[in-house]
């Protein structure tokens, strides 16, 4: 909590802890994870297991480029006002390179992932999957391909007077 209010970039600290030049006498990963856990708990009501899972998921967003797979997290509730949006606000401060959208097209999502490698935070995705089936299937396809290194999503792009298939790398948390 102190790190967030003091303007310290917790994500940067997590990333530094995972590099070879990490100096344990100057940084304690367990302490950072504890502080991250406490920061989330300060703003969102979750049980201990949920807090642990989200804390570790946040850490994973800072290390995904060193892995073959990246986990996704889905936050759902049957009740309005349960704190999903508040959790999203907290995640936007703690994850690596956040990209938050409540209304995104497949075209935008593919290009943002390929260009920026963001942590994708999709608000109200349950409404998307209940709505336009074609749009939902495109987003689902991107997510299904993007959890693994080398995952691609193909789109047609204009080239001159015709269209050519282009494979986009969509590996991103």
Where are the regions a protein language model picked out?
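Replication-associated primase and helicase/ATPase modules
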Residues: 1-46, 129-132
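Alpha-helical structural motif
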Residues: 29-32, 36, 54, 87, ...
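Pre-Walker A (pre-P-loop) alpha-helix and adjacent loop at the N terminus of AAA/AAA+ ATPase modules
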Residues: 32-71
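Short, mixed-charge, low-aromatic patches
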Residues: 12-17, 43-49, 65, 95-98, ...
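General structural signal for secondary-structure boundaries
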Residues: 1-2, 47-48, 101-107
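Conserved NTP-binding/hydrolysis core of motor NTPases
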Residues: 62-173
């Amino acid at each position: 909590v102190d790190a967030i209010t003091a303007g310290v970039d917790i994500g940067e600290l997590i990333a530094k802890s995972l590099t070879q030049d990490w100096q344990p006498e100057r940084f304690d990963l367990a302490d950072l994870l504890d502080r991250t856990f406490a920061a989330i708990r300060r703003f969102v009501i979750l049980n201990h297991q949920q807090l642990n899972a989200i804390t570790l998921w946040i850490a994973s967003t800072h290390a995904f480029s060193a892995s073959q797979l990246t986990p996704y997290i889905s936050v759902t509730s049957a009740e309005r006002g349960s704190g999903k949006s508040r959790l999203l606000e907290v995640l936007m401060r703690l994850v690596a390179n956040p990209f938050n959208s409540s209304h995104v097209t497949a075209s935008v999502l593919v290009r943002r992932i390929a260009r920026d490698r963001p942590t994708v935070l999709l608000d109200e995705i349950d409404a998307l999957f209940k709505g336009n089936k074609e749009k939902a299937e495109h987003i689902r396809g991107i997510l299904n391909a993007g959890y693994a290194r080398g995952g691609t999503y193909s789109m047609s792009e204009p080239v001159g007077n015709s269209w050519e298939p282009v494979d986009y790398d969509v590996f991103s948390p």
